[in-house]
């Protein structure tokens, strides 16, 4: 059963999304609760599946991953049973999503070189046709999900002269 999160729970989740290493005392101060209360709330949020894990965000270039790409793959239905275990075992696949549209899968991948990427794409073509986009730059990194105001900002129109 879905449980509604109160303002304090939402603020705790928001703070942990920004910095999962934030000390309990800091969180407690920001939500005006005691550290034991915050600890109990975090435990409950984990138990209820609201918080599903904690990760370090790592700079791929430090590990010489210079190529980041998104690959669309149209998996042939008869190949899906063998595709899922294969893709799960590929460490260079950061994320793989089943999507709607012309392609059935969208993957985010990292590689050291374009030739490694090319070799991987060749392997993927065993499962179906691909379309690849290599990332030049990233304007918005992965971030936490929005918990507050989710209205899309309105662009101000320039006045016509």
Residue ranges and their predicted role:
Residues 1-161:
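A compositional/biophysical signature of low hydrophobicity enriched in polar/charged and small residues
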């Amino acid at each position: 059963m879905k449980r509604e999160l109160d303002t304090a729970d939402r603020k705790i989740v928001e703070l942990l999304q920004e910095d999962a290493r934030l000390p309990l005392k800091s969180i407690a101060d920001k939500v005006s609760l005691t550290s034991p209360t915050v600890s109990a709330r975090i435990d409950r949020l984990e138990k209820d599946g609201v918080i599903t894990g904690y990760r370090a965000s790592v700079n791929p270039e430090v590990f010489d991953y210079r190529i980041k790409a998104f690959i669309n793959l149209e998996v042939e239905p008869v190949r899906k049973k063998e595709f899922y275990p294969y893709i799960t075992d590929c460490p260079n696949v950061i994320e793989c999503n089943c999507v709607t549209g012309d392609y059935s899968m969208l993957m985010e991948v990292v590689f050291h070189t374009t030739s490694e990427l090319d070799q991987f794409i060749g392997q993927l073509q065993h499962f179906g046709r691909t379309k690849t986009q290599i990332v030049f730059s990233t304007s918005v990194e992965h971030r936490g999900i929005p918990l507050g105001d989710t209205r899309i900002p309105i662009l101000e129109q320039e006045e016509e002269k």
